[in-house]
Design a protein with these regions (language model features):
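Predominantly extracellular/luminal regions of secreted and cell-surface proteins
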Residues: 86, 90-121
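Trp- and acidic/polar-enriched beta-sheet ligand-binding modules for extracellular glycan
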Residues: 42-67, 106-108, 131-139, 147-148, ...
Length: 249
């Protein structure tokens, strides 16, 4: 009598179940390890996917004033957050690439201080820690030395007393003359007094936290900041500007 070569009934049943399980897992985007009956999550995406984000290493200066500032009578004014700003997340390895980088200004003969103080790392805000530019619309421009991926621009105008700087505009560009690939990443000049275009961002009160602007990883070599006086007087001030980024690939 010829032996029965058909697989035992229980083996055929297990094979059918395993095939069904594999099919279901495939529909869910899961994989099954060979010979295993448990599903495994897909492996992490390969290079080119979204990078892991970590808090950028910001060191804040000591606050120069405390309490809630009095009504500054400035339109379109942002309400105080009332708590510390949330950490800003960027890819690991992002640093302040503006430290000690060259700076030029629309006013190269400041009333107080030197233009180089804009990137010297001193952000305390006390006397001797800031540069004072003349009245009307003025700007400072930082040369990062090469194209960078810019994730955030953080700056302090003057935080010794509460005040609001007017027509604040932050731009990125590929050239020093700001004629190539110019992008505006912040603009609170709501009535286009500066002639740079009306912006939708709000005015804000200067504090020791500075103003942090999300640049979203934009590629640029030059960073320019404008202002047009402040709520206390017609002069323009900069304590420090930091640019958080990394060399462009």
């Amino acid at each position: 009598m010829t032996p029965d070569t058909r697989p035992p009934r229980h083996t055929a049943t297990l094979s059918s179940c395993r095939a069904a399980t594999l099919a279901a897992a495939a529909l869910l985007g899961l994989t099954l390890s060979p010979g295993a009956a448990t599903a495994q999550a897909p492996a992490k995406a390969a290079a080119g996917s979204a990078e892991e984000r970590v808090p950028i290493p910001i060191k804040l200066p000591k606050p120069m004033f405390e309490g809630t500032p009095e009504n500054l009578a400035v339109p379109n004014l942002m309400k105080p957050l009332g708590r510390p700003r949330d950490p800003f997340l960027a890819p690991a390895g992002v640093t302040n690439v503006a430290k000690d980088k060259p700076v030029v200004s629309s006013d190269m003969e400041p009333v107080i201080g030197e233009i180089e103080q804009v990137t010297d790392g001193d952000k305390k805000g006390a006397d001797g820690s800031y540069v004072e530019l003349g009245p009307a619309l003025q700007h400072v421009t930082i040369d990062l030395g090469a194209p960078h991926e810019v994730f955030a621009v953080l700056f302090w105008h003057f935080h010794k007393t509460p005040r609001v700087y007017l027509d604040v505009v932050v731009r990125l560009a590929d050239d020093a003359a700001f004629t190539k690939n110019v992008r505006t990443i912040f603009d609170n000049d709501h009535d286009d007094t500066s002639g740079l275009g009306a912006g939708k961002d709000k005015n804000y009160v200067e504090t020791a936290e500075g103003k942090l602007v999300d640049a979203k990883g934009a590629r640029a070599r030059y960073v320019r900041l404008y202002s047009n006086g402040n709520s206390a007087n017609e002069l323009n001030h900069y304590v420090e500007v930091e640019v958080y980024g990394r060399p462009a690939k």
